[in-house]
Amino acid sequence: MASGDGGDDAGVKRVADRYLKREVLGEGTYGVVFKAVDTKTGNTVAIKKIRLGKYKEGVNFTALREIKLLKELKDSNIIELIDAFPYKGNLHLVFEFMETDLEAVIRDRNIVLSPADTKSYIQMMLKGLAFCHKKWVLHRDMKPNNLLIGADGQLKLADFGLARIFGSPERNFTHQVFARWYRAPELLFGTKQYGSAVDIWAAGCIFAELLLRRPFLQGSSDIDQLGKIFAAFGTPKSSQWPDMVYLPDYVEYQFVSAPPLRSLFPMASDDALDLLSRMFTYDPKARITAQQALEHRYFLSVPAPTKPSQLPRPPPKGDSGNNKIPDLNLQDGPVVLSPPRKLRRVTAHEGMEVHMHRADRTEEHPSGARHMDDMSSQSSRIPMSVDVGAIFGTRPAPRPTLNSADKSRLKRKLDMDPEFGYTE
């Protein structure tokens, strides 16, 4: 690659003499993503420019993991890494260009998703996950905006910066992965030994988000997230999840019985509810796998999944206006009195007494909005895509990401891992 960054006749910047730089698509903590044209092929690409940092800090280990893993993961439902090269003190990763992502689809109120459309998106997501797990790779950051959609309608898993090889029974991982709303309960309870089941739980949350057109479980803290989970599926018993009480950050919750799953997803088919229940199984050892999910009767029943090329997609960027469905939280969570700590008991609903052990101070957090009592009775009149923003008129909640403490913890772990986590 040439070292110059000269401009062409149109004044467009070149990157490494091959890529014509276009507009910026997004920015993050470690760099920027911009659109570009590959002059060698004529194809539009997306380039992630990652800051390499100071000399002593070395190359960003997260980027190295992503490069290593994506070179091994070649599948129609996984983003393609086309090129990777250092240039002017930065590391550049070149990906195929994808027009939009699943979050944009979910939040666009002009898009009406049929049951066949939802089935198609879930099928493509699970195909990508099944391929990863077959190759012993955990994604660990499943969420709608990491599921990219191309011009042909194909959905592809992207952002493998937190992905890791798994399979060694004694290997420990950090539990501070995934955005909180998509974390499995075993991660919230602090487990450091886990497998592909954590990706399946997150995939279940995405399935639920497609059905509801809003994030399903919106906790404001880890302990509040567990409260949201238990309010939706009931407090797990030891018979359901024997290993739960031995997890490092286990917290005892007051028992709450599970509401009917139909009351949470009134428009979903029986087959969809059955698959959801298997993806949301508490015991990770009993949770359905991605391959088993693909063989579930949900994908064999009518209607058949929509062909990717026929799926609805949002308009180009800049034309969507305010057509986003606000994030709502229609479930009561626990009264949060302090950060998680061992040997405590927390009630799952407002107004109930909370029994605490070794808790020194209290902090209150607001609960989410309540379910509308008559929603199930109206299910026959409600389309598959619900304009919940118009129904409830609630301000959107901020979508969580890894916070600074999580990032610092991850950075320390990465800096101390000389093998980058590629080998067992």
Curated annotation (Swiss-Prot):
Q: Which reaction does it catalyse?
A: L-seryl-[protein] + ATP = O-phospho-L-seryl-[protein] + ADP + H(+); L-threonyl-[protein] + ATP = O-phospho-L-threonyl-[protein] + ADP + H(+); [DNA-directed RNA polymerase] + ATP = phospho-[DNA-directed RNA polymerase] + ADP + H(+)
Organism, scientific name: Oryza sativa subsp. japonica (Rice)
User: Where Phosphoserine occurs, residue numbers?
Assistant: 168
The record's active-site residues are 141 (proton acceptor)
Q: What does this protein do?
A: CDK-activating kinase that may control G1/S phase progression. May control the rate of cell differentiation to accomplish proper development of organs, or in response to a changing environment. Forms a complex with cyclin CYCH1-1 that phosphorylates CDKA-1 and the C-terminal domain (CTD) of the large subunit of RNA polymerase II.
Gene (name only) = CDKD-1
What residues bear Phosphotyrosine in this entry? 30
Query: Whom does it interact with, and what assembly results?
Result: Interacts with CYCH1-1.
Q: Which InterPro entries match?
A: CDK, CDK7, Kinase-like_dom_sf, Prot_kinase_dom, Protein_kinase_ATP_BS, Ser/Thr_kinase_AS
Species classification: Eukaryota, Viridiplantae, Streptophyta, Embryophyta, Tracheophyta
| Transmembrane domains' residue ranges | none
- Assign the protein's first listed, main location to one coarse class: nucleus
Q: Which parts of this chain are annotated as the region Disordered?
A: 303-337, 359-424
Record protein name field: Cyclin-dependent kinase D-1
